[in-house]
């Protein structure tokens, strides 16, 4: 069994400049951080003792004979993209969906990470970010920018720059004292 824990993110500056329609023409940059709220994905092989081959547990339970029958678009497309079969996947989170903190992208990154582990392959932070962007923006055709997937994959406090269909991540290093000060003066609404 593989268990992943992927952080959620909040942005400080640059929201909207992570949209390809914007940054391909003008460039873009965001400052974001992950924080101590997470999504958890478990993935394991499902023995052939059941009358279904894939089980997905989130706010619903889906049991299907083939991953292409899954209603959840991100899971269906990720399983097809990485050729995953005969699995039980569960999703839990510290925060509700649609909170504005990148929950769907954290789920995508955590799920892809779990799938790579199940296959015995290493996926770098960069690879996870790029695959999550492809999954959500291309395969699932969800509107939005790129910062959520990148923040979830890289974690920490970062400046993320966007230009010409690509991105780069630069960690922002701050002292433990400054981090405590920042944490004690932030409020989320």
Predicted regions span which residues?
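Generic N-terminal targeting/processing segments that precede catalytic cores or assembly contacts
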Residues: 1-65
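Anion-binding (especially nucleotide phosphate/pyrophosphate-binding) glycine-rich loop
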Residues: 36-135
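ATP-dependent small-molecule kinase catalytic core of the GHMP/sugar-kinase superfamily
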Residues: 2-7, 13, 18-28, 117-189
């Amino acid at each position: 069994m593989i268990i992943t824990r992927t952080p959620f993110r909040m942005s400080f500056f640059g929201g909207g400049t992570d949209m390809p329609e914007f940054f391909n023409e003008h460039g873009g940059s965001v400052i974001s951080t992950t924080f101590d709220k997470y999504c958890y994905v478990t993935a394991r092989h499902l023995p052939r003792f059941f009358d279904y081959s894939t089980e997905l547990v989130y706010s619903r339970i889906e049991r299907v004979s083939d991953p292409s029958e899954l209603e959840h678009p991100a899971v269906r497309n990720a399983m097809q993209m990485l050729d995953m079969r005969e699995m039980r996947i569960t999703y839990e989170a510290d925060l509700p969906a649609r909170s504005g903190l990148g929950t769907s992208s954290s789920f995508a990154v955590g799920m892809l990470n779990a799938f790579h582990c199940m296959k015995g392959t290493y996926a770098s932070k960069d690879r996870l970010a790029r695959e999550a962007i492809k999954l959500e923006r291309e395969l699932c055709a969800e509107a939005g920018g790129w910062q959520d997937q990148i923040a979830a994959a890289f974690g920490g406090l970062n400046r993320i720059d966007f230009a010409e269909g690509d991105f780069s991540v630069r960690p922002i290093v701050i002292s433990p004292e400054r981090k405590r000060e920042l944490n004690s003066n932030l409020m989320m609404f």
